[in-house]
Amino acid sequence: MKLLYTDIRTSLTEILTREAEELVAAGKRVFYIAPNSLSFEKERAVLECLSQQASFSITVTRFAQMARYLVLNDLPAKTILDDIGLGLAFYKCLAELNPKDLRVYGAIKQDPQLIQQLIELYHEMTKSQMNFLDLENLTDEDKRADLLLIFEKVTAYLNQGQLAQGSQLSHLIEAIENDKVSSDFNQIALVIDGFTRFSAEEERVVDLLHGKGVEIVIGAYASKKAYTSPFSEGNLYQASVKFLHHLASKYQTPAQDCSQTHEKMDSFDKASRLLESSYDFSELALDVDEKDRENLQIWSCLTQKEELELVARSIRQKLHENSDLSYKHFRILLGDVASYQLSLKTIFDQYQIPFYLGRSEAMAHHPLTQFVESILALKRYRFRQEDLINLLRTDLYTDLSQSDIDAFEQYIRYLGINGLPAFQQTFTKSHHGKFNLERLNVLRLRILAPLETLFASRKQKAENLLQKWSVFLKEGAVTKQLQDLTTTLEAVEQERQAEVWKAFCHVLEQFATVFAGSQVSLEDFLALLHSGMSLSQYRTIPATVDTVLVQSYDLIAPLTADFVYAIGLTQDNLPKISQNTSLLTDEERQNLNQATEEGVQLLIASSENLKKNRYTMLSLVNSARKQLFLSAPSLFNESESKESAYLQELIHFGFRRREKRMNHKGLSKEDMGSYHSLLSSLVAYHQQGEMSDTEQDLTFVKVLSRVIGKKLDQQGLENPAIPTSPSSKTLAKDTLQALYPAKQEFYLSTSGLTEFYRNEYSYFLRYVLGLQEELRLHPDARSHGNFLHRIFERALQLPNEDSFDQRLEQAIQETSQEREFEAIYQESLEAQFTKEVLLDVARTTGHILRHNPAIETIKEEANFGGKDQAFIQLDNGRSVFVRGKVDRIDRLKANGAIGVVDYKSSLTQFQFPHFFNGLNSQLPTYLAALKREGEQNFFGAMYLEMAEPVQSLMAVKSLAGAVVEASKSMKYQGLFLEKESSYLGEFYNKNKANQLTDEEFQLLLDYNAYLYKKAAEKILAGRFAINPYTENGRSIAPYVQQHQAITGFEANYHLGQARFLEKLDLADGKRLVGEKLKQAWLEKIREELNR
């Protein structure tokens, strides 16, 4: 046993490679062992350090893979399960347990997260050399009983199926202990690099090999000052020093100092010594100069995106300045990989920098996993429509074109069908011939045939089920679709898809192994397959060595690359505090460690945090050979963040924080990194909205435009203007002539007017282009409204001989029997329930009509408008016509005054602010239209809410009080003529704010005509701005911005072009209510009309 340590600015790999070469010269076969996270990288580093650049006698590997290189004899032939197979085994065993048998985990026994935690605990106990029976020492009786039962069941199953238990390393330990290794230990040597602690399993291997006479060399980084210090607690090197002291004590071998004498202390050595001095409370006087600050830079950026752009520019600039540099000389370290992953790809592709993020990718979100999930959902939930649509959207099932899939989806959404029997029936319903039923039935059979065959499978042996699954994949064209998908992709993506397919096949192989000879139902098979795929991960290797490697900062080793950029070093990310998320608490781990024999040790993450994080920081500071950049954003994941305390310490030592910003207001030579990034910079420059007028900038932009123009001309493209915000074009004259011929009447409805003032472009989409909502055969808000309207229309038309309640019930019965409504509301139990709710609403609303003796209804569903009477006249002489339908017209019995009623499904009131801004013209339009038809005497226009009143019982003292409060909400809401209000009863909300004099009434009608005139002039001129209104000046309501995917309008970027609603100018800032508020708005209307 030989122990070595060296200062952190001397390459430990070089020293250990020399040791390995000496061992080879002595006739040894050397295994160069590196940690799992560094083995791939360490192999390249060792090859670079070898004097011959190669050696057949040195194998760079990991502890777990050593068994592959040793000859093991007479071991029983057992199949080894990986995490996927182990997960399936846990799933199978837990499925067989009764939930009542598990006191803690019974309700979640097949939850994927629980299974994942059980797998992790299984591995942890294996690595720590702990037996599952050791769990008897747990103090929590319920948890102890559950875990022992689960592991006992799984262990018995693995033994029964001749499936190997434990890890590869545990099998090697078993082989060495039982003398099953025929390799000559005297010819083997181990060189161990990069460790600061061994797991119990790794330490056991080292111990056994040492006992067999294997020469072992172990190296670590440590300063002589730290190693010889009697007190190491809190020291930066605490992790490595304790590791060396433990080994030195165990094997009675002092560690040798291999540190080299450096002619000059470099910037990173200086920073390391200052940090070490800070943590061991010793005094050290070192000056940090400008060269040090240049070599070790600390950046403060605004956002993560800005960080990545600055890094990309810096790399591009260095490559431009030094032709000897290549991408492999750069390394990027991330504070949080998940937060940077998406932006990293976007920005580095933009700057055309090849990179490799050495991280396994989960299959959970791959279309193949979604494909299996959709089939499982179809089986489990009995063929829901949504699950079938999700299956088709994966683009992996059947070889149907996208247009066929869209047509099929549109039709089944129209039908609203669910359940396999419904899909098996021939499609016969169509909406006025809109659907091609013949084609849709062909698609239906193509989609259903493979699924029907698969779903007919009963519980059977796993082997037979896999054969049926294979046939299904073939008949469903899944393999063909995957093949077609990959042929159109780039080489890197093709490799990625190939790895995904391998992972998918591996899950099936593990299933076949675990369930060999077992009876499995189709649903269980699909659930297991989905569970296995959700746990699966895949990874690709870089296509070329010359790439920028990207990794998490806590996996870095000293002296890794010439230039290192560590970004995202916020207080939350550096240091990383490991959290215990396993099934065993830290306290339980401590108790188990104390109760078991020496050498059996579960890791307690919280006890390792401090020494691990300090050593990581030391490695980070020394990761670069030439230049190191440490960066922290002020905003991390859209939340304010602070830079790490470690960075603040470096600043305290004399290193300088540099405020780094992307400057899009000016362009410089730094923007010439790559063609794509140059275009991006130009776009950002234009989007600033303010062009610099300096001669230098203007010249640069002109030259840049010419260069880009030539490049685009070579590609046969135009050089378009770069838009700064979504905009629309005015319609051409010939288009307007075709849409609105001069001799043809121009009609504008009240709903069209409201849509125009909500967003002019929405009016264009709906009323000019005719954009329609998806058709639905099932009842919706429109059909519910028609149903209630028809009931009241019929009830009020019936003779008055019978009581109102009798007439209402007769109207309900007759309307329910109408063919249209009978087809809708008898189709399903859900529709029948909806009908019952609507009938309750009808009976409740009838309360107002039943007890209102002051009025009589003279018309129902009355049409108004038409060619006979123009609504308004435009300045150019063209007439605008308005037509529509009034739900009901009432007449006062006292004097014959007319009132208009409009039914609403929710509480609706007339609001002067909305009316002024064109958003509430319905009632004034009805009154104006009737006035043009000869009516002169009005008592008002109002809304009637058709809904059951809801009253909170907490807000009232008694049930009688609840009835009183509920009746208050059941009133007509709207506008009333002051002179007629005395004739109206309690069912009318006729407060002062809702009452108008004759002059005020006419003022409203005049302003309403003005709103129609303004809208009509813009529509006939073909001008439709993208200007959704904003009520609060900060956001756009969802119902206003319904066509965002078409317009591209985003409130956070384009709020400036939204229409801000007009408001009252209140000089004293007092809030007006009631009559004063009405008068203020009427005055504003007068001012607007007098302009």
UniProtKB/Swiss-Prot annotation:
> What is the similarity comment for this entry?
Belongs to the helicase family. AddB/RexB type 2 subfamily.
The answer on whether this UniProt entry bears the keyword RNA-binding reads no
Q: Name one GO molecular function term.
A: ATP binding
Keyword annotations for this protein?
A: ATP-binding, DNA damage, DNA repair, DNA-binding, Exonuclease, Helicase, Hydrolase, Nuclease, Nucleotide-binding
GO BP term, example: double-strand break repair via homologous recombination
Which cofactors are reported in the record for this sequence? Mg(2+)
Quaternary structure (record)? Heterodimer of AddA and RexB.
State any further remark. Despite having helicase-like domains, this subunit does not have helicase activity.
* Name of the protein this chain belongs to: ATP-dependent helicase/deoxyribonuclease subunit B
Pfam families under this entry? ADDB_N (PF21445), PDDEXK_1 (PF12705)
Q: Which gene encodes it?
A: rexB
Q: Which PANTHER family match?
A: RECBCD ENZYME SUBUNIT RECC
Main function:
The heterodimer acts as both an ATP-dependent DNA helicase and an ATP-dependent, dual-direction single-stranded exonuclease. Recognizes the chi site generating a DNA molecule suitable for the initiation of homologous recombination. This subunit has 5' -> 3' nuclease activity but not helicase activity.
- Its Enzyme Commission number(s) read 3.1.-.-
Source organism of the structure: Streptococcus pneumoniae (strain CGSP14)
